[in-house]
Amino acid sequence: MTTELRRKLVIVGDGACGKTCLLIVFSKGTFPEVYVPTVFENYVADVEVDGRHIELALWDTAGQEDYDRLRPLSYPDSHVVLICFSVDAPESLDNVQEKWISEVLHFCSNLPILLVGCKVDLRNDPKTIEELSKTSQKPITFEEGQVVAQKIGAYKYLECSAKLNEGVNEVFETAARASMLKFKPASVPKTKKKKHCILL
């Protein structure tokens, strides 16, 4: 009989980008219709990956700036980190590079990171497209998400819709698989020291 593995997953990203809905749909199977900002919340869910049973402790966090000093308390003893953004909010993808990746690398430097595009059901939503066009913006494309994932050295880029329950299980199966790896951040962006060549 195989022993059950326990893994801790932390999810971060801008406020209202879809983190909590993603966790609730995966762990409870229901989509919460009312938005209530999270401070800290924990869920537990089981996942079967490659014949192994894994208990995932899911740590939800607040994306709002008010909680920037509290959020780091969620990071210790984690095995994998999800950085989320919403495809209907281009600034949430900008913040992946401008805020979230530096915070995650500071507190979880050797962990696998998954970049997750949430709310993909809104990508082709006429109302969303119209609203974004007022500020000369468009919903984030799959390719744009993938480019950012490569830039931040993510283990993988995935997309999902918690509302339609599409791609949700794949996100957590991939995260569980990543959490079992001995991870070395080979492609994490680092500031390179300039080397000077001296010609003799």
Curated annotation (Swiss-Prot):
Membrane topology: Lipid-anchor
Similarity comment: Belongs to the small GTPase superfamily. Rho family.
Motif interval(s): Effector region: 35-43
Protein name as annotated: GTP-binding protein rho5
Primary localisation category: membrane
Chain sites annotated for binding GTP: 13-20, 60-64, 118-121
Subcellular location: Cell membrane
Superkingdom of origin: Eukaryota
One Pfam family named in its UniProt record: Ras
GO BP: any one term: small GTPase-mediated signal transduction
